[in-house]
Amino acid sequence: MSRVVVVTTGGTIASVADDRGVLRPARTGAELLGDEGDRGVQVIDMMAKDSSQLTIADWDRIASAISAAVEDGTDGVVITHGTDTLEETALWLELTYDGAAPVVLTGAAKTADAPDADGPTNLRDAVALAGSADAQGLGVLICFGGAVLAPLGTHKGSAGFNGPEVVDRKERPFLGTVSAVAAPRVDVVACYLGADAVALDACVAAGARGVVLEALGAGNAGDLIVEAVQRHCAAGVTVAVSTRVPNGRVAASYGPGRALADAGALVMPRLRPPQARVLLMAALATCSPVGEVVARWG
């Protein structure tokens, strides 16, 4: 029988309505698992947070729990997680974990007290995947709604996740084992009609060593943003260009996008801002060649 460790962090999968109808994480891992808990599954109730309230330090706590489980000989680890930031946690773990035991993140679109709650099915699927010999060596996976997805390029949709499905093997974009808390600050700055450089300048003044632009269209921004990017890139800040458009590639094909690239910004062709930030954090934290990392994995 496979040994699987389930680490709970909260999220919709564990949430129920309180007496005011407000949804809050309240169910334990044992309650979520039901009979499944008697089948070689160990539960670690780490925290009970809405994933919008998770911090960078929580990534280190999750990583430590994974390391301890792997060192203890577990066959796989499941992380229950809120869907708001699951794509960010999954990618950070993917970039910084190189163990053979699979790490599977799952959650739910509906609360634990909903009559048609999807959490129990998602959790059962995730436990089965984590304990499967076929998942050995695949690294970090997202198991949700009957699909198995690679973290890189996955993003939240209205009732689940959109991303590359894992059929057999997948490349693992491991950059190095590092502490999230020790990683350089990387911020996301939104671009919009008439945007100036105030937000970008403020992020750099606050200590950001990297900034992801949530650019317009295929990767465009106004002149004031372009001028600020040129200043900050010249001063050693890494700027990457993503987009606010849900789908499609980013490219320096229009004049403003080319101006950003000429100013020193890196074009993040595939990743949306939340994951672009995570990739930039990991690249800077591991002292990897950022341009090469973005070109290969961005």
Name each model feature, range by range.
Residues M1-G298:
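Active-site histidine-anchored catalytic micro-motif
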